[in-house]
UniProtKB/Swiss-Prot annotation:
GO terms for cellular component: cytoplasm. Binds 1 Mg(2+) ion per subunit. Homodimer. This is Adenylosuccinate synthetase. GO terms for molecular function: adenylosuccinate synthase activity; GTP binding; magnesium ion binding. It comes from the Bacteria.
């Protein structure tokens, strides 16, 4: 039994897809356990970029099984489109498996997402308008439609009719919006179900059988710990649990079967959308990091907010997700800066604190306390070991590990597979 969980430790966009792709080389099964097509991950293979939103990064390894677990909310339209994209690129998807217990995103979820966000006015939370939240709402309310239901024509028709009637009353009475028609949705989405049914199965059985057989299983999280609905900057969060604990619920494996948790972070911080961000930069340095790091959302295309590395956030993520190893990405983006800063604590009303407050009002008053380190001017994109890094960059990497309190297993100096440097093999240490 050998398993590794990959989680984002910031607000998403940390490079989880790249690290999952890297670790997938030694895995036999790769599984997603939460989120939906609101997540975006970019994988670079032989210099070519592939952008995925729903299908696990392991799909590029035809001999390995890629799993969409029961905790994922699946938009069949997006899934069929992504499958077609991969097929057009010559990528086989015969190794994909989709949980029959995963819930389905339907057009009324997306419409409701938009209406709810518009109604918030200046209090928007920055949703991607993908219907993720409303789909999880239906799941919790026990009125959701699962993949298993989508494949059964009579059950799908019955549940869609009931749900659509309820949602249309909401659209008309509360939001003064146009109702949706049953026939078009039913025909379109039932057809999508038939297109994907070859991949549908009980993925909990596949995952547990693999673990019991001693195979290496890699669990791939979406978003990040700071977007977790319980542990993140609520309400500016996603509607699921990206923390490592989400694996057990979202994939159907027990907690005793998790061996390692790899936390992925960037050498700085970024986030898309609204919400607290203590180390956010509004100056030329911030703009430089955004441009050099190409900090624009994979899903939305929106410019990401950027800031200095926040070790307070990272220690929070380490604690609530049980992180055992750290993967530090995008060190190259900081090249050329005379000084680099790391937030080591916050000043809250004149008191130094080293924890991340739950209160949004307190977070507004938190001022980052920085430790300044000398920067480096060298181009490090060709570095292939820690010793090859300039001394100042090497010191930065070491200081990050010290402040977070987790050993760094890999560091990356660019988006390519070959730009990921191993300090300690995660698989070998299990």
């Amino acid at each position: 039994m050998t398993s590794v969980v990959v989680v984002g430790t910031q607000w998403g966009d940390e490079g989880k897809g790249k690290i999952t792709d890297f670790l997938s080389a030694d895995a036999e099964v790769i599984a997603r356990y939460q989120g939906g097509d609101n997540a975006g991950h970019t994988i670079v293979i032989d210099g070519k970029k592939f952008k995925l939103h729903l299908i696990p990064s392991g799909i590029f390894f035809p001999q390995k099984i890629s799993v969409i677990g029961n905790g994922v909310v699946v938009n069949p339209k997006s899934l069929v489109k992504e499958l077609a994209y991969l097929h057009d690129e010559g990528v086989t998807t015969d190794n994909l498996r989709i949980s029959d217990r995963a819930h389905v995103i339907l057009p009324y979820h997306i419409q409701l997402d938009q209406l709810q966000e518009d109604a918030k006015g200046d209090n928007k939370i920055g949703t991607t308008i993908k219907g993720i939240g409303p789909a999880y709402m239906d799941k919790a309310a026990r009125v959701g439609i699962r993949i298993a239901d989508l494949l059964d024509k009579d059950i799908f028709a019955e549940r869609l009719r009931i749900n659509l009637a309820e949602k249309n009353r909401l659209f008309e009475k509360m939001y003064d919006s146009t109702p949706l028609g049953f026939d078009a949705i039913f025909e379109e989405y039932y057809a999508y179900g038939q297109e994907i049914k070859q991949y549908v199965t009980d993925t909990s059985v596949i995952l547990n059988d693999a673990l019991d057989a001693g195979k290496r299983v890699l669990f791939e999280g979406a978003q990040g710990v700071m977007l977790d609905i319980d542990q993140g900057t609520y309400p500016f969060v996603t509607s699921s649990n990206p923390v490592a604990g989400g694996v057990t619920i979202g994939s159907g494996v027990g907690p005793s079967k998790i061996n390692k948790v790899v936390g992925v972070c960037k050498a700085y911080t970024s986030r898309v959308g609204d919400g607290p961000f203590p180390t956010e930069l509004f100056d030329e340095v911030g703009e430089r990091i955004r441009e050099v790091g190409h900090e624009y959302g994979t899903t939305t295309g929106r410019p990401r907010r950027v800031g200095w590395f926040d070790s307070v956030v990272m220690r929070h993520s380490r604690r609530v997700s049980g992180i055992t190893n750290l993967s530090l990405n995008s060190i190259d983006v900081l090249s050329g800066l005379d000084t680099v800063k790391i937030c080591v604590a916050y000043d809250l009303d004149g008191k130094r604190i080293d924890y991340y407050p739950a209160s949004l009002e307190q977070l507004k008053r938190c001022k980052p306390i920085y430790e300044e380190l000398p920067g480096w001017q060298e181009d490090i994109t060709g570095v292939r070991s820690l010793d090859e890094l300039p001394e100042n960059a090497r010191n930065y990497v070491r200081r990050v590990g010290e402040l977070v309190g987790v050993r760094i297993s890999t560091f990356s100096v660019g988006p390519g597979r070959e730009q990921t440097n191993i300090l300690e093999s995660v698989w070998a240490s299990i």
